[in-house]
Each structure stands twice: as structure tokens, then as C-alpha cells.
Amino acid sequence: SFPTRRSSDLKGEKEFSGNGVSYCAVCDAAFYKDKITVVTGGGDTALGDALLLSRFCKKVYLVHRRDSFRAGRALQNRVFATENIEALTNATVSEINGDTKVTSVTLLQNGEEKQLDCNGVFVAVGSVPDTKPLANLVKTDKDGYIIADESGKTSADGIFAGGDIRTKALRQVVTAVSDGANCVISAEKYLDEKQ
């Protein structure tokens, strides 16, 4: 089981998913080399995605519906110091436009509507773990992620959790694989001790 990125339900989001709309900057940033992208969101994920994209893209617009970001101060400082990132606050993307690929977004900012040319939109409004089947067995945090230590040990005896469903800072394939290896070793050790 793994978390799924939250969608924004933007007009055009589903139509252009995989053709200019992405939910993973780590996966897709290189496809936008020397292009213009829009990142939607205001938390750590959005600002981290904007920073990553800034290393590839000519321009990155960071669009957030509030007047200030929720991300950590150090991350915000890095974003604001990056020349090719432009933060657009009190703004929302109301529509993603294009033919076969994304060509622009319709932006609503401070009551005014305008078109913003871009080649890609990165939706970075968080993720939702699929842990409901385990909700009565193990402790989860407020967002539904299973609370587990580095060995994968959870609050329930003999249940180990790894990958993107457990509490941790980075959710990528490489960290999930590492978690899996740790869980296997921990489960083996657990079973050996039970014999």
C-alpha cells in the first residue's frame, strides 16, 4: 500500500495528466529542461518541488492560494532566494489549458483572471496514505501514516510498516526499498525470537 498524491480537481487536470500535469517533480523534472512550469501548493512538498524544478526549468511559478506559505522558514528562504522561482500568492489555478499538451493555466489572483503560459503543471498539495485496513491494528499520525521506527516496528506486536505509508520525511522509491529491507530483517529477527 502506498499514498496517492492528492489531486486538486482543477479543470483540465485529469485530461492533461501525463501530458503536462505531474504529481512527482523528482520523477518528471528533467522532462521540463529549459521550459516554464507551475507548481500549485504552499507546503513543504510544493516548495521542495519548486526548488528541484528550478534546477531544470527556465522559470517556475509557485502558486499558492494564501498570502503566506506553510512550509518551513528555511525552505521558504531558499525558494525566495532562487532567481527563476516566482511566488504568486493569493492566487489559484482555475483551469489548465492546452490541446494535446499543457500550454497555459488560467490564474485567478486577487480577483483578477489572467493566462500564464507554461509547459507543465506540478500538483503538490500533499498525499493520502491508503492505511484504512490497518487503522484498528496500528497507531497512525493525524494524516493516516503508520507510526513506525527505522526498523519498521509499529505499535502492534509483529506488524512492520515500510515505504510511503509510514511516517518519514522523504517518500521516494529508494527510501521505500530501504524500508522494505529493514522490515524483512526486523520480521526475521522477530520470528526467530518467537521460536
Q: What residues fall within each predicted segment?
A:
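A Rossmann-like FAD-binding core segment of flavoenzymes
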Residues: 55-150, 189-195
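Generic hydrophobic/aromatic pocket-lining and core-packing "Φ" positions
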Residues: 50-51
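FAD-site-proximal beta/loop scaffold in flavoenzymes
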Residues: 9, 14-31, 124-175, 179-182, ...
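Short, small-residue-biased leader/transition segments that mark boundaries at the very start
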Residues: 1-7
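Residues that mark the start of a beta-strand
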Residues: 20, 35-36, 59
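Glycine-rich Rossmann-fold phosphate-binding loop(s) that bind the pyrophosphate
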Residues: 41-43
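N-terminal Rossmann-fold NAD(P) dinucleotide-binding loop
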Residues: 46-47
